[in-house]
């Protein structure tokens, strides 16, 4: 009887959270371990309504092995017809007192990071998004070879309010 109740609560929770996420169009994650500076996290987007406007986010899950207060990323969106948009981004990961900005229980925190707003995917075909870490230690020219503490990298598309 107790396990049936636990299963019911689990299923109810999943339904509750999935029904509250009406803005979500795309939300995928890639698990990583010791993110190498040359490794790309890739996402392919297909069948996105070209008449709508969207907001884009990068989702990062980190644990206490992440030793930095910020995160530098290089992103690239490849459009179906060949156009490419590249960005170098910096995000704060902690408050000034060192407390994580992300939400979550235990060691793992999740940060939903604004990437772009009011984006139209007006070309038909597949879009490709790549995300690469670009972290360096203070004073170093070379990037950090293996970035510890990032457990998952995600890409999310939401319907825009505009």
UniProtKB/Swiss-Prot annotation:
<keyword id="KW-0472">Membrane</keyword>
<feature type="lipid moiety-binding region" description="N-palmitoyl cysteine">
    <location>
        <position position="20"/>
    </location>
</feature>
<protein>
    <recommendedName>
        <fullName>Gliding motility lipoprotein GldH homolog</fullName>
    </recommendedName>
</protein>
<keyword id="KW-0564">Palmitate</keyword>
<keyword id="KW-1003">Cell membrane</keyword>
<dbReference type="Pfam" id="PF14109">
    <property type="entry name" value="GldH_lipo"/>
</dbReference>
<dbReference type="InterPro" id="IPR020018">
    <property type="entry name" value="Motility-assoc_lipoprot_GldH"/>
</dbReference>
<dbReference type="GO" id="GO:0005886">
    <property type="term" value="C:plasma membrane"/>
</dbReference>
<keyword id="KW-0732">Signal</keyword>
<keyword id="KW-0449">Lipoprotein</keyword>
<feature type="signal peptide">
    <location>
        <begin position="1"/>
        <end position="19"/>
    </location>
</feature>
<feature type="lipid moiety-binding region" description="S-diacylglycerol cysteine">
    <location>
        <position position="20"/>
    </location>
</feature>
């Amino acid at each position: 009887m107790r396990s049936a109740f636990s299963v019911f609560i689990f299923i109810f929770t999943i339904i509750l959270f999935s029904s509250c996420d009406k803005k979500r169009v795309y939300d995928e994650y890639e698990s990583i371990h010791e993110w190498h500076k040359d490794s790309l996290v890739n996402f392919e987007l297909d069948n996105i309504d070209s008449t709508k406007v969207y907001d884009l986010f990068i989702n990062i899950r980190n644990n206490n092995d992440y030793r930095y207060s910020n995160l530098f990323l290089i992103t690239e969106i490849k459009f179906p017809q060949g156009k490419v948009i590249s960005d170098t981004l910096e995000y704060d990961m902690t408050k000034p007192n060192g407390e994580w900005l992300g939400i979550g229980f235990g060691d793992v925190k999740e940060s939903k990071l604004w990437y772009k707003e009011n984006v139209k995917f007006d070309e038909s075909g597949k879009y490709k998004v790549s995300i690469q870490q670009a972290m360096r230690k203070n004073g170093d020219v070379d990037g950090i070879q293996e970035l510890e503490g990032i457990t998952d990298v995600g890409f999310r598309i939401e319907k825009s309010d505009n």
